[in-house]
Design a protein with these regions (language model features):
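An amphipathic alpha-helical micro-motif enriched in hydrophobic residues
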Residues: 41-49, 57-79, 87-94
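Compact nucleic-acid interaction/catalytic patches
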Residues: 83
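Extended low-complexity intrinsically disordered regions
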Residues: 1-60
């Protein structure tokens, strides 16, 4: 039996790039834009808050991951439109 893979941030960035790739990406993901994923972002943020309020710390990492996925999604959209990328987001928060 082999150990489960340990994923890193670059794996998530790669996954999003694959989902949004014009050739062979996910049809649903390819249709999305900044505005269309806002409801999903809000839902994920509420799920993080709910897990914290319920002190469900076993489930919190999964909910935080879902919220991080939203940030990665926006970053991919920004990169595609040559507005910004994930590194810009990280630099922005770190420089604050």
């Amino acid at each position: 039996m082999s150990a489960a893979p340990v994923y890193q941030l670059n794996d998530l960035l790669y996954l999003m790039a694959r989902l949004r790739h014009p050739d062979g990406g996910c049809p649903w993901d390819l249709q999305q834009d900044f505005a269309s994923i806002v409801p999903h972002t809000l839902e994920e943020a509420y799920e993080v808050a709910d897990a914290i309020e319920r002190e469900d710390f076993a489930h919190l990492p999964s909910e935080l991951g879902d919220l991080l996925f939203q940030v990665v999604y926006y970053s991919q959209l920004g990169q595609e439109q040559q507005l910004f990328d994930f590194s810009t987001v990280v630099h922005s928060i770190t420089a604050k």
